[in-house]
Amino acid sequence: VYDFAEDKNKRLWIATMGFGLFYYDLKTKEFTSIQSRTSLINEWIGCLHYSDDNKLYVGTYDGINCIDLDSPDFQSHKILSQNVIYSIFEDDEGVVWLGSSEGLSGWNKNTKELTTYTTADGLPSNTIYAIQGDGKDFLWISTNAGISQFQKKNNKFINYYVSDGLQGNE
């Protein structure tokens, strides 16, 4: 089991490596597999994010799915494929940020636009392990080559390394 996310219906979603997606109903205390009810890109799931609009973002080893939990058959839509997704973070503007093996991607839920940032844009590495917002229009990003602060307003990265005081870059 790699991650959990609780939805508004008191279901605890469970990400597994190789066994797909499950949920545990906190009211009935029953487990349910939804492998046969969705079209997940991949059953190797590393991270989950539950959004207030009742969507579950499922980060897999081959991209990300967005599952509409209001749909009776849990309809799944592919957002980004062919990337290992390590982390998911949603900011206050409704942008879902994805940390992957191929950089940092921001998916705007309203416009459906996907923007990807890589080392060519200033990241120290394209392997993004974690993303966290700080409430000041910045994202903090951990990579396998240091930490970055991403300034969303001007799309700039400030990178921090061992030389700046980190214990290690990874």
Provide a role label for each language-model segment:
Residues 1-170:
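Carboxylate-rich, polar loop motifs that coordinate divalent cations or form catalytic acidic clusters
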